Amino acid sequence: MKEYIKSSVSKNRKEYYLFNQTPIFILNEFPPHININQIIQILENYIPKFMFSFIEGIYIGEFEELKDRNIQALFKDSAIYLSSFKDSEGVSEEIIARDIAHELAHAMEDKLSYEIYYDSKIENEYNGKKKKLLSILRYGGYKIPEELFFSDEMVDELDDFLYKKIGYDKLSLITPGLFLSPYSITSIREYFANGVEEYLLGEPAVLKDISPILYNKLDTLDGQLFSGEMT
């Protein structure tokens, strides 16, 4: 990624800023119907300024690592790397803003890991939900070893099983009331990031209903960061 960024320095790279402090570097343009200023407006209207202090910047381009992993965004090395969505149908400013919010959550987790997880409450809520889902799937005829769901070394295998063996569409029908989305099942990091995304740019009331402990943690952190208790 760094080499790709360096090679673009002499080209027509565009720069924007969030809250006049966090740079957005556009190495490859979004599709014509996407308005970068509208994305910035969404982010500035709904995401607290302090959250952008967790990153050094946002890079938008055609990054091989994103393509290889079949993902649209990634938090890495204190920055967010985002696809330019040149081949994506149905993409909107709202979708892109949510992708950024999701990666901001990973940046927040990187900086505030102790504050988020020290009391094990989120972990217990997350694991309790996975136990319920495992019971539902076994009742439905799936033979699933428990270690697939609860081993930190098998996160990729679990993701592959959920996506290919069961399918996200089917999981969406099984998991209402348990998880915000099938993607949040795979790891506690994704459970947390999906929660932050919903808290900031979705429906906080839905998060509070589905994941009350996660919601309360975010509400507490939000208040502490705004008041300066953690700065």
Residue ranges and their predicted role:
Residues 51-54, 111-116, 204:
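Long, hydrophobic, amphipathic alpha-helical segments used as structural scaffolds
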Residues 1-31, 59-65, 159-176, 181-183, ...:
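Non-catalytic architectural context of zinc metalloproteases
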Residues 1-28, 38-41, 62, 78-79, ...:
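C-terminal or late-domain output modules
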Residues 91-95, 99, 187, 191:
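Short, conserved micro-motifs enriched in small and acidic residues
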Residues 97, 103-123:
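Catalytic Zn2+-binding segment of zinc metalloproteases
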Residues 122, 126-167:
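Low-complexity, serine/threonine/proline-enriched polar segments
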Residues 154-231:
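Pan-zinc metallopeptidase signature
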Residues 12-80, 84-94, 118, 136-149:
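Auxiliary, metal-adjacent structural segments of Zn-dependent hydrolase domains
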